[in-house]
């Protein structure tokens, strides 16, 4: 059997830093520890589903033109999203360019988190395209869902104001 070529160039993800994390911490504890150490606000979103297995997904954006952070579980019970050597439990993704100093500081901070055995930057020639594309799709779905919810909230607020105005008009005419 011919071995698979695990090298895929990730041209569209050049500004993404991919950190492999080995940790026995459960997802929410790891996210909380990373939040505390890096002053982030990673929040749990809908799981990424591959081959029927849910893999936890955490998301945080520091605002427009800033970094976007994701924490993705690579293990769900007996399923593995992507096998890596050495074994990884999570991917921590940082979108948008980081200065070398900022990357060093983030890596130092991650390695100081109690419960993280190893954290290292993965080379972009690893077989990451599928997971990065899936995460990008998931983010877009979240943005669309949030926008739709904001639109619904705006409509509700307008309706509430119109109802208040109608009540006030009825009170004046009485």
Language-model-detected regions and their locations in the chain:
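Short amphipathic alpha-helices in soluble, non-transmembrane regions
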Residues: 33-37, 104-112
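Terminal, regulation- and interaction-focused segments at domain boundaries
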Residues: 6-27
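Short, well-structured hydrophobic secondary-structure segments
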Residues: 26-66
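Short cationic amphipathic helices and targeting signals
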Residues: 16-23, 89-98
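Conserved short beta-strand edge segments in small beta-sheet-based binding/regulatory domains
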Residues: 44, 80-86, 115-124
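Glycine-rich, aromatic-bearing surface loops/beta-hairpins
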Residues: 108-174
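Long, continuous compositionally biased terminal/linker segments
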Residues: 2, 53-90, 98
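Acidic, serine/threonine-rich, charge-biased low-complexity segments
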Residues: 42-45, 49-53, 68-71, 75, ...
């Amino acid at each position: 059997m011919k071995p698979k070529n695990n090298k895929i160039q990730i041209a569209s993800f050049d500004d993404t830093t991919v950190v492999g994390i080995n940790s026995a911490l459960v997802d929410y504890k790891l996210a909380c520890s990373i939040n505390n150490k890096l002053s982030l606000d990673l929040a749990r979103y809908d799981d990424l589903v591959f081959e029927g297995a849910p893999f936890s997904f955490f998301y945080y954006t520091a605002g427009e033109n800033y970094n976007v952070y994701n924490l993705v579980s690579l293990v769900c019970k007996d399923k593995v999203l992507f096998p890596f050597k050495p074994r990884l439990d999570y991917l921590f993704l940082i979108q948008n360019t980081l200065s070398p100093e900022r990357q060093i500081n983030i890596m130092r901070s991650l390695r100081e988190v109690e419960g993280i055995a190893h954290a290292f930057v993965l080379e972009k020639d690893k077989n990451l395209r599928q997971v990065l594309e899936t995460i990008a799709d998931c983010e877009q779905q979240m943005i669309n869902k949030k926008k739709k919810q904001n639109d619904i909230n705006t409509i509700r607020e307008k309706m509430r104001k119109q109802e208040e105005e109608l009540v006030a008009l009825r009170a004046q005419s009485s």
